[in-house]
Structure formats: C-alpha cells, structure tokens
C-alpha cells in the first residue's frame, strides 16, 4: 500500500472517530438531560455540541477534514473543495461513526434501548410543527453552519502573493491567524445553532445525527424533510461563501 493510500485511509478512519465522538457527545447529552429531567436541557446540549466540536476539530484537523457532518462534506464536494469520490467515502465513514455512536450511547445509559433512541431521534417538537417549518429550520441552520465552515476552514481567503512569495498587501498577514481560531468559530456556531431550532425541528443541522437513530430504530418520520433541508441549506451556505462573499482582492 502506497503512502498516498495510507494517508487516505487514515483520513477516512479519522473522520469515523471524529463523527463517533461528536455523535456520542450529542446523543448522551440529549438522552441524559431528558432522563434526569434537566430544565436547562437545551443549554446543556448546546454547550456539549459547541465544546465537543471545538475539541474534535483541533484534534483531528491534521489527519482529516474534520467535518463530522455530511452536509459540509457534500457542499465541499459540489464546490470542488474536496474530490468527489474521496468525499463519498468520507460521508460513508461519517454515517458509520454516528451509527456506532448511537449504539454506544444507549449502551452506557440506563433505560430501554428503543426508548433511549427515541429520545435522541430528531423530530418535530410539537404536533403543530409542519414539514415546512422543519425544512425551513434545518435549511437555515445548516446554511449558517456551512457558510462559517467554508469561510474559516473549507475555503478560507488566501492573501495573494508576488513571485517572491511576499504578500501584496502586508496587512493581509493578519488573515493567516484565522486558521488558528477556525475551530472556535465553528464550535460557537454549532452551539448557537443548536439553540435556534428548539421550538420546531429540534435543531439537528447534521444528516449523520438524523440518520443514526432513525436507522437503529427503524422510525423514519420526516427523514426526507430533515435531509432535504440540511443538504440544500448546506449548498446555499457554501455557494454564498464561494461565489458571492469570498473576499475580492
């Protein structure tokens, strides 16, 4: 096996573990908050999502794309920030990581298997929440997340340089420092987006988070609404950053 293929395999495995850790954090915080009757449940979940996201990106960004979100990966593929077939494999490993995370979460917490997965499964929070509201919530939340991910990580602005490698505008050197804080920006975005969907879709904005409990329970209510909103929202967010809001020198 060549060095190139070893690096690719390491990247796929890294994305699997990044997705597993994120999924485990999300599912256990959701289930645990519900089981213990925490009135601050949404805050607990949002903080868990934000802090785990920051830790995962810092830990895995040297060996993999550290998306742990198929909507980000799909948008990166569509806008040629990621090879198509490589992106497909990354998404497969992401979903696998979330499925194992779902199983691990129900294994470590008390209660019946399916009851715990039903708690973790994204769903409308009230009967009067329509498909359109679920779609709209997931669409806009995913668009926001993917825009930020593109701006600071997937497709960040790169200051132009002359033939000697010097930046044409010395002040642009400050831009390079944003790469260090990119995980913080993405983590904060994960956190506040998690709070914005609590009255409608529950705020998933991640196809992997949606698919795992649905696959494990066999309950597919509104699955296409969630996925359509997330993938289309991701395309909007990525497209805006790539073609409209990318800095012009």
From Swiss-Prot:
Topological relation to the membrane, as annotated: Multi-pass membrane protein
Transmembrane region(s): 12-32, 40-60, 84-104, 134-154, 180-200, 224-246
Keyword entries, A-Z: Cell membrane, Membrane, Repeat, Transmembrane, Transmembrane helix, Transport
Location of the motif NPG: 206-208
Keyword Transmembrane annotated: yes
Keyword Repeat: yes
GO CC terms, sorted: plasma membrane
One family name in Pfam for this protein: MIP
One Gene Ontology molecular-function label: water channel activity
Location, primary (coarse class): membrane
Cytoplasmic face of the membrane: 1-11, 61-83, 155-179, 247-249
Motif (NPA) on chain: 69-71
Extracellular topological domain residue ranges: 33-39, 105-133, 201-223
Subcellular location: Cell membrane
Domain notes: Aquaporins contain two tandem repeats each containing three membrane-spanning domains and a pore-forming loop with the signature motif Asn-Pro-Ala (NPA). In microsporidia, the second signature motif differs slightly and is Asn-Pro-Gly (NPG).
Function: Water channel required to facilitate the transport of water across membranes. Involved in osmotolerance.
Record-stated family: Belongs to the MIP/aquaporin (TC 1.A.8) family.
This protein's name: Aquaporin
Species for this entry: Vairimorpha ceranae (strain BRL01)
Recorded name of the encoding gene: AQP
């Amino acid at each position: 096996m060549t060095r190139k293929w070893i690096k690719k395999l390491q990247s796929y495995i890294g994305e699997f573990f990044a997705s597993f850790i994120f999924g485990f954090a999300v599912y256990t915080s959701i289930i645990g908050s519900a089981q213990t009757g925490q009135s601050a449940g949404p805050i607990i979940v949002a903080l868990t999502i934000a802090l785990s996201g920051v830790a995962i990106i810092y830990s895995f960004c040297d060996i993999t794309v550290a998306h742990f979100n198929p909507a980000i990966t799909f948008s990166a593929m569509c806008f040629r920030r990621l090879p198509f077939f490589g992106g497909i494999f990354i998404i497969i490993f992401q979903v696998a990581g979330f499925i194992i995370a779902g199983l691990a979460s129900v294994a470590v917490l008390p209660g019946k298997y399916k009851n715990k997965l039903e708690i973790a499964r994204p769903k409308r929070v009230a009967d009067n929440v329509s498909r359109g509201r679920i779609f709209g919530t997931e669409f806009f939340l995913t668009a926001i997340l993917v825009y930020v991910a593109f701006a600071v990580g997937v497709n960040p602005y790169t200051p132009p340089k002359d033939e000697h490698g010097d930046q044409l505008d010395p002040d642009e050197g400050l831009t390079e420092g944003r790469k260090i804080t990119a995980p913080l920006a993405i983590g904060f975005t994960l956190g506040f987006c998690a709070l914005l969907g609590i009255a409608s879709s529950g705020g998933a904005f991640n196809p992997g988070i949606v698919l795992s409990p649905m696959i494990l329970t066999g309950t597919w209510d509104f699955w296409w609404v969630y996925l359509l909103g997330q993938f289309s929202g991701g395309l909007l967010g990525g497209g805006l950053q790539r073609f409209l809001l990318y800095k012009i020198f």
